[in-house]
Amino acid sequence: LSLHDALPISKETIKFIKSKKWTSAMKSAEKVKDRDFRTLITWMYLKTTGNSATFNDYKKFIERNSDYPRINRIKYLAEQKIYLKNSSPTSIINWFEKNPPLGGLGKIKLAEAFLEQGKTAEVEKLIKDGWTTAEISKNDLGYYRAKFKKFLTSEDHLKRADYLAWERKYWDLKRMLKYLPKDYQLLYTARQLLMSKSYGVDNAISKVPDKFKNDAGLNYDRLKWRRKRGRVDGSLEILLKIKNNKDYLVRPDKWWLERSIIARALLYQKKYETAYKIT
């Protein structure tokens, strides 16, 4: 195609992208001879979540464009496309030797490959590291938990639940509840209901065991819940009773954001002394 002919096709490609018609966009881009243009469109496609690209599509792109912008994002997404049914354990291990896992799921995929080769020491470290933060679908959660059952303990499930709660990934947290010890199940059920703005919050909080009533995460979720409903006095009640130290707060950055929002509301009400006290 000449430059004159390529221009309307490239415009057509962009139009397909804007409409999220990626199959048509990719076919359209293939008609353009300019390699840089085709590479750009492929890059845009591979960055979209839920695409139908295979691991091989990602692998080819990464190998040919190792200096491309946001290549680590592409590598991270590539990890989610690795499946033992399509790749041998050796090829997966070789890939990760050149491209160390960037996400929790990547570590789990590598652990799975090592498990096939009976290398349990490598499996244990990777699965414990990856389990906490991995982005796992509902179906994969059950699959991986069953597959790595002898390596994962209640403590590992608790670490994952705590991470998901602080990151406010409440649907993922809900799926984890059944794997937690009963007392922790009650704590994280209350947190999950608070952050997802679901019914039954008061009832769930009343069931939280006494030893967790002053849990930092629970207090944080209650604070946020009250603040979002404009309950400044109720929010203050929590802020004034908790320990304001890093060890207790767990995530001081999140607490600070809530404090600053509530402090602004107090300043607006001319309650300067109280605003000063909580900041």
Regions found by a protein language model. Name each.
Residues 2-7:
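Short, small-residue-biased leader/transition segments that mark boundaries at the very start
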Residues 8-21, 159-164, 221-226, 262-268:
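Alpha-helical segment of the N-proximal tetratricopeptide repeat
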Residues 12, 42-45, 78, 110, ...:
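Structural register within alpha-helical repeat arrays
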Residues 26-36, 47-50, 59-69, 81-83, ...:
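Solenoid-like repeat scaffolds
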